[in-house]
């Protein structure tokens, strides 16, 4: 059944806006903010520059919109893990899995995060920075729950957050390098994320447990 012309016209602005966002994510991830040109975005999205400026105001406005939207969805996903009904050990395992799943499902996000880190966060507005600050309190809540349950010892939430986030960011972002190393026959680095997730779960739990040699199932 053909969509009525009036309905198609209502959908067109939404579709164009979503296409601009998709193209912009790919370009910002591949080139960074400074090297991305509005002309390129408009050409690849098949819109004129005026429409892009109409929706987002400027290249910086578009970039901030994407970053804020991505961080907001990321933090919401991690908040779900922290607030779920589960033991602290289960939550730590799920936290690692959620990090890996989210950064794999949204491959432009780790690249944009690493580029922004290299730029000193110069393009992050106050609202986005505030949203980023929720990760450490969430990690702290997992540690404190484990301490109340008698299974975790003392641990620094900032260090744990950087260890888990940094490791996962690096693993997901360097997939093309691992693939090329395999193709050249220099080594056989893993391409699948499941073994990485499993190992990072065990490392995290072992570092947190009062008795690191006392194994618990994390399935």
Where are these regions (language model features)?
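C-terminal peripheral helix-coil segments that are non-catalytic and often amphipathic
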Residues: 1-4, 101, 105, 133-149, ...
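Basic, helix-initiating cap at the start of DNA-binding domains
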Residues: 1-31, 35-46, 60-64, 72-73
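Short coil/turn segments at alpha/beta junctions that flank glycine-rich nucleotide-binding fingerprints
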Residues: 30-34, 85, 106, 149
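Short hydrophobic/aromatic patch on the recognition helix
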Residues: 45-56
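Amphipathic alpha-helical linker/stalk segments
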Residues: 66-94, 124, 142
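Hydrophobic alpha-helical connector segments
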Residues: 79-111, 157-164, 194-197, 219
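Amphipathic alpha-helical segments used for helix-helix packing
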Residues: 104-126, 174-183
């Amino acid at each position: 059944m053909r969509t009525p012309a009036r309905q198609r016209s209502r959908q067109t602005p939404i579709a164009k806006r979503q296409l601009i966002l998709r193209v912009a994510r790919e370009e910002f991830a591949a080139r960074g903010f400074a090297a991305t040109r509005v002309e390129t975005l408009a050409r690849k999205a098949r819109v004129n520059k005026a429409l892009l400026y109409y929706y987002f105001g400027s290249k910086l406005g578009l970039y901030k919109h994407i970053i804020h939207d991505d961080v907001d969805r990321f933090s919401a996903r991690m908040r779900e893990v922290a607030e779920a009904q589960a033991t602290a050990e289960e939550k730590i395992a799920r936290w690692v899995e959620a990090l890996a799943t989210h950064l794999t499902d949204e491959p432009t996000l780790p690249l944009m995060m690493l580029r922004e880190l290299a730029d000193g966060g110069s393009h992050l507005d106050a609202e986005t920075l505030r949203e980023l600050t929720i990760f450490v309190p969430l990690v702290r809540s997992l540690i404190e729950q484990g301490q109340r349950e008698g299974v975790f010892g003392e641990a620094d939430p900032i260090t744990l957050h950087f260890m888990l986030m940094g490791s996962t960011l690096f693993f997901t972002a360097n997939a093309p390098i691992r693939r090329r190393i395999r193709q050249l026959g220099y080594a056989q680095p893993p391409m699948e994320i499941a073994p990485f997730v499993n190992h990072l779960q065990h490392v995290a739990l072992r570092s947190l447990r009062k008795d690191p040699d006392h194994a618990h199932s994390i399935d």
